[in-house]
Amino acid sequence: NRQHKEIRDSINYAERIQSAKLPPKEEIKGILPQSFILFLPKDVVSGDFYFFEKKHERIFIAAADCTGHGVPGAFMSLICNEHLTVALEKSSNPGEILTIINKGIKTALRQTDSIESTKDGMDIALCSIDLQKRRIEYAGAFNPLWIIRDGSTEVEVINATRRSIGGF
């Protein structure tokens, strides 16, 4: 029926907006030719996003999972993605960046320690790759870092903190 079509069209339009915030895969491949992206969101729009930005001699990569599914998750992903972009202007240290995002999300969503406060936020793994020093720095909120070294099939896991970004 007409109402169902309007909802579907609206969700498809929201997907185009959400996709526009994702970095182009070709850009990532151009800088990291042996990389790949495994991005399989559950719904047309979702709370999942990946992030990539080259800033000076550093590359920042993130994989994030925001609270909520579908449209509410998509709203959260746009809010969290924007806070990540803003935090990168203030610091290049992954731990500091996550702290800045945490404060920003809590302020934006008016989260307090009260029971009535929303518990929305995100889990994230954030890496900074220093191209000159050939060094990776990582910080994570509930999302660990998985490393597979060249020529190996072994997965090395670096655990994240057991706290999410935002009101948890």
Where do the protein language model's features map onto the residues?
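… and, occasionally, acidic/histidine-rich disordered N-termini of signaling adaptors
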Residues: R2-F168
